Amino acid sequence: MIRYSAIVQGRVQGVGFRYFIQLTACKLSLTGWCKNLMNGNVEIEVQGLENNVLSFVSEIKKGNGFAKVSDIDLNILPVLDGEKKFSIKY
């Protein structure tokens, strides 16, 4: 198990990107959350099997066809026990 925080930069708000993030995380059996930041970026915390998290990051970099990701800043975090789902925070 591994957990990352990520700040995603680019055209990532107002284009269905958080929903795309949530769907991608659920398909890969990952937990965590994502939310829009006031500066136009999206913040993500994601946790799961390392290969699945790496696949998630790869998919997020590609975007959903409407979003345009210019950069992702990743940092490793301690794993959270008991987290059961991936949610969108508002």
Curated annotation (Swiss-Prot):
Q: What is its EC number?
A: 3.6.1.7
Which transformation does this protein catalyse, written as a reaction?
A: an acyl phosphate + H2O = a carboxylate + phosphate + H(+)
- Asked if the Swiss-Prot or TrEMBL record annotates the protein with the keyword Cell membrane, the reply is no
Q: Pfam families under this entry?
A: Acylphosphatase
| Keywords linked to the UniProt accession | Hydrolase
Q: Does the keyword Hydrolase apply?
A: yes
Domain (Acylphosphatase-like): give its ranges: 3-90
Catalytic residues, per the record, are R18, N36
According to the UniProt record, what class of enzyme is this?
A: hydrolase
Any one GO MF term held by the record is: acylphosphatase activity
Q: Which family does it belong to?
A: Belongs to the acylphosphatase family.
Against PANTHER family, the record matches this protein to: ACYLPHOSPHATASE
Q: What is this protein called?
A: Acylphosphatase
The organism of origin for this protein = Clostridium beijerinckii (strain ATCC 51743 / NCIMB 8052)
